[in-house]
């Protein structure tokens, strides 16, 4: 017979999905945020996004070229990192500083740890934190290019002491200050719908993260308006949809995803409500990224008929 059995080590591919197709879906889901940022902040938003993407792809290509490794840029993961990092900075961010964040994200966080699938934290997330710590003044310029916008709208909603002054419609549509990707909740929701519809991500993490934050704020403030304003403000929605759901740095079981989402809500609420820092999403995500291996271990599904080693040893000793 001419039939040959090809035996290879697991895992065996049982799906037509590839890294490239998954990343392509994420890019499509990010498009509403990119378009909304251009409408709200002007065409410079597109320049910031383009520079970030080109820098990430270039750094990945150059690193692999110098170390004579296979070129992975066709999987589009560097493009996703570039867009997400661009959506995490203000429109006036100096491009040179942004490129430093791209360098940290791609070379230090991603490639030095072995490339895609090996990073301990979300590359774009760490890049944002490095930019925030290193260039705080640039990262905190919450202004519209249009000088006609009033001061309340041009400030980030998290900086407004009286949340009753915040319009929920303005928060949902993005008529307020903030970084490029976090302002328009409508665009983020459209991206979420696409990702869930294409089964690129599970709704478990965004729902448990945002839902727990809403409940915590509702209990703390006794106000539905304040709780909704907290959910629609800052980087919560963008982080919950595009960063907390990262395949590498999030749990793989449903139970683990729910635990992860609620834990993110607890940490973010604690930082925002009791801490001196008005945001909290980035640091909460980084903190919980470190706990993902333990969450995976604790929530791992036990195969039917599995006997724990301690119990097996005890039974063997009794014979």
Where are these regions (language model features)?
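Structural signature of hydrophobic alpha-helical transmembrane segments
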Residues: 42-55, 92-101, 171, 175-185, ...
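Membrane-interface helix-loop-helix junctions at boundaries between adjacent transmembrane segments
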Residues: 77-78, 83-149
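Long hydrophobic alpha-helical segments that form multi-pass transmembrane helix bundles
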Residues: 117-189
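Conserved mixed alpha/beta catalytic, RNA-binding, or beta-rich assembly cores of soluble enzyme
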Residues: 196-223
């Amino acid at each position: 017979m001419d039939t040959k059995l090809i035996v290879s080590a697991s895992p065996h591919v049982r799906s037509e999905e590839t890294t490239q197709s998954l990343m392509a879906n994420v890019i499509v889901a990010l498009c509403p945020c990119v378009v909304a940022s251009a409408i709200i902040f002007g065409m410079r938003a597109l320049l910031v996004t383009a520079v970030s993407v080109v820098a990430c792809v270039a750094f990945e290509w150059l690193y692999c070229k110098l170390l004579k490794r296979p070129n992975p840029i066709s999987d589009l993961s560097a493009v996703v990192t570039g867009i997400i990092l661009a959506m995490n900075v203000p429109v006036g961010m100096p491009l040179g500083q942004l490129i430093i964040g791209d360098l940290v994200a791609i070379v230090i966080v991603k490639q030095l740890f072995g490339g895609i699938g090996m990073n301990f934290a979300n590359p774009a997330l760490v890049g944002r934190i490095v930019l925030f710590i290193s260039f705080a003044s640039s990262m905190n310029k919450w202004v519209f290019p249009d000088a006609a916008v009033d001061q309340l709208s041009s400030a980030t909603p998290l900086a407004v002491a009286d949340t009753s002054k915040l319009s929920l419609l303005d928060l949902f549509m993005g008529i307020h200050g903030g970084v490029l990707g976090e302002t328009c909740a409508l665009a983020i929701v459209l991206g979420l719908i696409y990702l869930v519809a294409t089964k690129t991500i599970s709704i478990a993490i965004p729902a448990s993260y945002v839902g727990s934050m809403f409940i915590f704020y509702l209990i703390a403030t006794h106000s539905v308006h304040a709780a909704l304003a907290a959910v629609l403000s800052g980087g919560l929605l963008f982080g919950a949809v595009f960063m907390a759901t990262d395949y590498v740095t999030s749990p793989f079981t449903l139970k683990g995803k729910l635990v992860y989402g609620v834990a993110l809500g607890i940490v973010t609420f604690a930082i925002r409500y009791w801490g001196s820092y008005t945001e909290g999403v980035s640091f909460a995500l980084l903190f919980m990224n470190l706990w993902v291996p333990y969450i995976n271990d604790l929530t791992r599904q036990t195969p039917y008929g599995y006997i724990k080693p301690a119990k097996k040893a005890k039974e063997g000793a009794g014979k």
